[in-house]
Amino acid sequence: GCIKTGSFCTLSKGCCTKNCGWNFHCNPPNQ
């Protein structure tokens, strides 16, 4: 699943395009 991240979340880190609540969430590239 996605993990909570700050604004440092980038596409290279596997960002989801959806905003789950207050923060964008990221999926680690290895998941």
Swiss-Prot record:
It is found in: Secreted. GO terms for cellular component: extracellular region. Confined to the epidermis and to the mucus layer. Its main location: secreted. The record marks F8 as: Hydrophobic/aromatic residue important for potent activity. Disulfide bonds join C2-C16, C9-C20, C15-C26. GO terms for molecular function: sodium channel regulator activity; toxin activity. Keywords: Disulfide bond, Hydroxylation, Ion channel impairing toxin, Knottin, Neurotoxin, Secreted, Toxin, Voltage-gated sodium channel impairing toxin. The keyword Disulfide bond applies. Coiled coil: none annotated. The modification 4-hydroxyproline is found at P28, P29. The presence of a 'disulfide through disulfide knot' structurally defines this protein as a knottin. Negative results: does not show effect on rat Nav1.8/SCN10A. Belongs to the nemertide family. Highly potent toxin against both insect and some mammalian sodium channels (Nav). It potently inhibits inactivation of insect sodium channels of B.germanica (BgNav1) (EC(50)=2.6 nM) and also delays the inactivation of mammalian Nav with potent activity on Nav1.1/SCN1A (hNav1.1/SCN1A; EC(50)=7.9 nM, rNav1.2/SCN2A; EC(50)=24.3 nM, rNav1.3/SCN3A; EC(50)=105.6 nM, rNav1.4/SCN4A; EC(50)=46.4 nM, hNav1.5/SCN5A; EC(50)=215.2 nM, mNav1.6/SCN8A; EC(50)=36.3 nM, hNav1.9/SCN9A; EC(50)=97.2 nM). 1 uM is enough to completely inhibits the inactivation, resulting in sustained non-inactivating currents. This is Nemertide alpha-6.
